[in-house]
Amino acid sequence: MYKRQGFGQLDAITTGLNRTDLIIIAARPAMGKSAFALNIAVNTCKATKRDVVIFSLEMGKEQLVSRMLASEALVNNTLLRSGNLEPSDWEKIAGAADTLSQLPIYFDDGAGCTVPQMKAKLRRMRNLGLVVIDYIQLMQSANKNASRVEAVSEITRSLKPVSYTHLT
């Protein structure tokens, strides 16, 4: 299944998202990885009407929803969090909230998630189109003695089959 993401140059390079893709977004801290992943989640959900699950190991779902609202409404998230918005911005937020509330996006912000726990949760989903894992480095590895690099490698390898078995 080919899904354009609304990022023209990236779509041209990657041909969009395909069902069996495992895509890792990597960059230095505070470069917008989470915001980018949330945009991909919303765009995928809008385009496909399929469920999107976001496993966030760093931020709570309230913070994620705030970021999604600000992005969808095209308002500054810092101003949204502080409540210092213009009346016209509040109208944009209300419209964005209405739009986002119609989308089947689910959040799991449980700390210490493991790949088997994640797979068990995904098995209950019937119309799954995308899984986002924010901050994969915080996932727990089955091998408690592994270095962080080894643990992330093992987690990544064990995630690839998820696209074959859980995405529709």
Segments predicted by a language model, with ranges:
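Conserved glycine(s) of the Walker
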Residues: 32
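Cytosolic-facing regulatory segments adjacent to core modules
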Residues: 12, 35, 39, 43-127, ...
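Substrate-engagement module of ASCE P-loop NTPases
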Residues: 151-167
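P-loop (Walker A) phosphate-binding loop of NTP-binding proteins
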Residues: 28
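Pre-Walker A (Motif I) flank of P-loop NTPase domains
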Residues: 19-23
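Pre-Walker A adenine-sensing motif
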Residues: 8-16
